[in-house]
């Protein structure tokens, strides 16, 4: 079925705000004939504060901008070396509930890490994916008119020190991890294709078209 097809956009390294605006515009103007899209992107350093975010969880942002976001969740950090995947899906058309989508995204990351020999798991009390007690992937979604936007952020080979300036996702002392701690050769270039392959498998392997910026 044609509408089952997904457009995959590799956007490279981009500032947060223009991508966020584009994502909102796409979601606001899409209709039932609009193909779903997955955007793969890295962001320049930025803290984003989710809808549930509290100012006290931003400890000392320093020179890194803080931007309000309408995704679910609390504050997180994006920076180069972190693979962000935005999922712009018509949930009604794909017969997916919100909880099912969260589980699907978490499983995408768990499966990707398993291929690398890294044992990871989701947590019922704190969305995202963890290796031991350390968080390696953050998750934040918004649903509008039955369509999802925002998505996940997987730490690949980034500088983790900016996370010390916040309480990640509202948890004081939450330790963060990245793939390169176990796989020094990991980069977003070699992780993104695995991530994409795993999410498409969980979406029942729809046709897709890959577009580079």
Swiss-Prot record:
UniProt: substrate binding residues: 71-78, 138-140, 151-153
Ranges where the BPL/LPL catalytic domain occurs: 32-207
Entry's EC annotation: 2.3.1.181
Keyword Transferase: yes
Acyltransferase found in the keyword field: yes
Gene Ontology CC terms, in alphabetical order: cytoplasm
A Pfam family per the record: LplA-B_cat
Pathway annotation from the record: Protein modification; protein lipoylation via endogenous pathway; protein N(6)-(lipoyl)lysine from octanoyl-[acyl-carrier-protein]: step 1/2
InterPro entries: aa-tRNA-synth_II/BPL/LPL, BPL_LPL_catalytic, Octanoyltransferase, Octanoyltransferase_CS
GO biological process terms on file: protein modification process
Taxonomy, superkingdom: Bacteria
Active site residues of this protein: 169
The reaction(s) this protein catalyses: octanoyl-[ACP] + L-lysyl-[protein] = N(6)-octanoyl-L-lysyl-[protein] + holo-[ACP] + H(+)
GO molecular function annotations of the record: lipoyl(octanoyl) transferase activity
Subcellular locations according to the entry: Cytoplasm
Residues with site note (Lowers pKa of active site Cys): 135
Predominant location category: cytoplasm
Keywords: Acyltransferase, Cytoplasm, Transferase
Family statement: Belongs to the LipB family.
Miscellaneous comment as given in the Swiss-Prot or TrEMBL entry: In the reaction, the free carboxyl group of octanoic acid is attached via an amide linkage to the epsilon-amino group of a specific lysine residue of lipoyl domains of lipoate-dependent enzymes.
Role played: Catalyzes the transfer of endogenously produced octanoic acid from octanoyl-acyl-carrier-protein onto the lipoyl domains of lipoate-dependent enzymes. Lipoyl-ACP can also act as a substrate although octanoyl-ACP is likely to be the physiological substrate.
PANTHER family with a match to the protein in the record: LIPOYLTRANSFERASE 2, MITOCHONDRIAL-RELATED, OCTANOYLTRANSFERASE
Protein's name according to its UniProt entry: Octanoyltransferase
